[in-house]
Amino acid sequence: MSLFKSSAVKGVCNKGKKPVIDVDEPSPKSKRTHFSTGVYDPDLFRSYAAFQTYTSQFRDTPLLVERAVDQHSLLDTNIPIWFATKDWNFLLSNLEDAYENLVKEFYANAIVEGEQIKCWVRGKRFSVTPVYLANILQINRPILPIPPVYDELTPDEEVLREALGANLEFSSNGKSISVASLSPELRLLTMIMFSNLYPLSSTGYMNLGQALFLHDLITDIDIDVCSYIFHIVAKTIDWTASRNCIPFCRLISRILKLKGVYPSEDERPYPRPSPITIHTLHASMSHTKKNPKQESHAT
């Protein structure tokens, strides 16, 4: 349950030696040294094909790490209203530290089979499903016959304008909208969305499916966010989307920790981005005034 709805749900503490709650079998921390040498290592990849996938698609792709949202500082904005009925607190809070090699190995080794991702990371086998994501994120999924795939939807312009503002600007081809044409608080919500809910590194424009996700969020339409996270992760694994970043890194790291997969002693956490606060809103407003809008492709 979100802080905006009542009190905060505290995430699992990363400090101290607490027992793992979701381990298939006991697994101590690895003591081996791990370097990205470019040489196939059967301890790190389930097959040579997985190693080739890692080398060609993931090794040089940067991580897009989720940003914690300082919910207390935003209580005087509209953000609390938009999240009031959503129990997405874990998605907005500090999850586990992300470890670059582990995250990339997760994606390179994973295989998507329908509504299941079969995973293999450093010898551990496990599966990820929308139901599993809901369990570890403590989210009550809405009952939807078929959760919409937002990437495949093309909503009517007027539907978007009614919720997102009459001044909403569309790109010349009509396939995306300008984030700068949104109100300051909607731009802040978009920043939260692009970081934690619908990962996107290029934030100047968003496609119509992403705009509909934003529309549904502020109009309190049910969103099966676990199904959509699964969809994004699966697309990244299959590389069916044109992506220049690797999403949900801290969520993946949380899954790995729960499954008893740990970084080696020489691995260090990926730098955490700054949290999203009321100061982020003020900085965004100032930046928009100083910089003209530039159109970019939204994928």
Indicate where each model-derived feature is located.
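A structural signal for long, well-ordered, hydrophobic/aromatic- and basic-residue-enriched core segments
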Residues: S2-S296
